[in-house]
Amino acid sequence: MTEMVPAWVEGRLMPVEKLEAHQRGLRHMAISVFVMAGEAVLIQRRAAGKYHTPGLWANTCCTHPRWGEEAADCAVRRLREELGITGLVTVFADRVEYRADVGNGLTEHEVVDIFVAEAPSDLPVNPDPEEVWETRWVDLTDLAREVKEHPERFTPWLRIYLAEHMERIFGKLRVVQ
């Protein structure tokens, strides 16, 4: 199935096939979700079959809205599709932009709406194996330390979020050094 995502081509937002957006390094819309249980965040290891950054740890979920889809609706959809998570209230945290090489000649140049959702630590999670290899809860401070010590284990966008946008995403109470 061809997935059309909102991307800027010559300064105009228009539908572009997702893989083409990455091949051309086009600036495009995305969403990222962080599900939190207190100070712990649910992270996922991307499935081995993903066409970029397979096997790397990422935030709870992320994707690109379909052409015409609202970012908030997309966040809820991907929690359900990737992780089988329903019933959480996602709250818009911020919008950030980044550009990163994700290997195999592909570039993520994303304008990302970031959402945070609070959940119980015993939240039922049922990952789609086509999308997610495994999940785990990790304390945000420990995650920030792991990313600094072993950046090669994590997606470029998670490294960027934690290095450059902690306060904007998690608020002053959750900022770690």
Swiss-Prot record:
<dbReference type="GO" id="GO:0005737">
    <property type="term" value="C:cytoplasm"/>
</dbReference>
<feature type="domain" description="Nudix hydrolase">
    <location>
        <begin position="26"/>
        <end position="160"/>
    </location>
</feature>
<dbReference type="InterPro" id="IPR000086">
    <property type="entry name" value="NUDIX_hydrolase_dom"/>
</dbReference>
<feature type="binding site">
    <location>
        <position position="108"/>
    </location>
    <ligand>
        <name>Mn(2+)</name>
    </ligand>
</feature>
<comment type="pathway">
    <text>Porphyrin-containing compound metabolism; chlorophyll biosynthesis.</text>
</comment>
<dbReference type="InterPro" id="IPR011876">
    <property type="entry name" value="IsopentenylPP_isomerase_typ1"/>
</dbReference>
<keyword id="KW-0602">Photosynthesis</keyword>
<feature type="binding site">
    <location>
        <position position="82"/>
    </location>
    <ligand>
        <name>Mg(2+)</name>
    </ligand>
</feature>
<keyword id="KW-0149">Chlorophyll biosynthesis</keyword>
<comment type="pathway">
    <text>Isoprenoid biosynthesis; dimethylallyl diphosphate biosynthesis; dimethylallyl diphosphate from isopentenyl diphosphate: step 1/1.</text>
</comment>
<keyword id="KW-0479">Metal-binding</keyword>
<dbReference type="GO" id="GO:0009240">
    <property type="term" value="P:isopentenyl diphosphate biosynthetic process"/>
</dbReference>
<comment type="similarity">
    <text>Belongs to the IPP isomerase type 1 family.</text>
</comment>
<dbReference type="GO" id="GO:0015995">
    <property type="term" value="P:chlorophyll biosynthetic process"/>
</dbReference>
<keyword id="KW-0464">Manganese</keyword>
<dbReference type="GO" id="GO:0004452">
    <property type="term" value="F:isopentenyl-diphosphate delta-isomerase activity"/>
</dbReference>
<feature type="binding site">
    <location>
        <position position="64"/>
    </location>
    <ligand>
        <name>Mn(2+)</name>
    </ligand>
</feature>
<comment type="function">
    <text>Catalyzes the 1,3-allylic rearrangement of the homoallylic substrate isopentenyl (IPP) to its highly electrophilic allylic isomer, dimethylallyl diphosphate (DMAPP).</text>
</comment>
<keyword id="KW-0963">Cytoplasm</keyword>
<keyword id="KW-0460">Magnesium</keyword>
<feature type="active site">
    <location>
        <position position="62"/>
    </location>
</feature>
<dbReference type="GO" id="GO:0046872">
    <property type="term" value="F:metal ion binding"/>
</dbReference>
<keyword id="KW-0414">Isoprene biosynthesis</keyword>
<feature type="binding site">
    <location>
        <position position="62"/>
    </location>
    <ligand>
        <name>Mg(2+)</name>
    </ligand>
</feature>
<dbReference type="Pfam" id="PF00293">
    <property type="entry name" value="NUDIX"/>
</dbReference>
<dbReference type="GO" id="GO:0050992">
    <property type="term" value="P:dimethylallyl diphosphate biosynthetic process"/>
</dbReference>
<dbReference type="InterPro" id="IPR015797">
    <property type="entry name" value="NUDIX_hydrolase-like_dom_sf"/>
</dbReference>
<dbReference type="GO" id="GO:0015979">
    <property type="term" value="P:photosynthesis"/>
</dbReference>
<feature type="binding site">
    <location>
        <position position="28"/>
    </location>
    <ligand>
        <name>Mn(2+)</name>
    </ligand>
</feature>
<dbReference type="InterPro" id="IPR056375">
    <property type="entry name" value="Idi_bact"/>
</dbReference>
<keyword id="KW-0413">Isomerase</keyword>
<feature type="active site">
    <location>
        <position position="110"/>
    </location>
</feature>
<protein>
    <recommendedName>
        <fullName>Isopentenyl-diphosphate Delta-isomerase</fullName>
        <ecNumber>5.3.3.2</ecNumber>
    </recommendedName>
</protein>
<feature type="binding site">
    <location>
        <position position="22"/>
    </location>
    <ligand>
        <name>Mn(2+)</name>
    </ligand>
</feature>
<feature type="binding site">
    <location>
        <position position="110"/>
    </location>
    <ligand>
        <name>Mn(2+)</name>
    </ligand>
</feature>
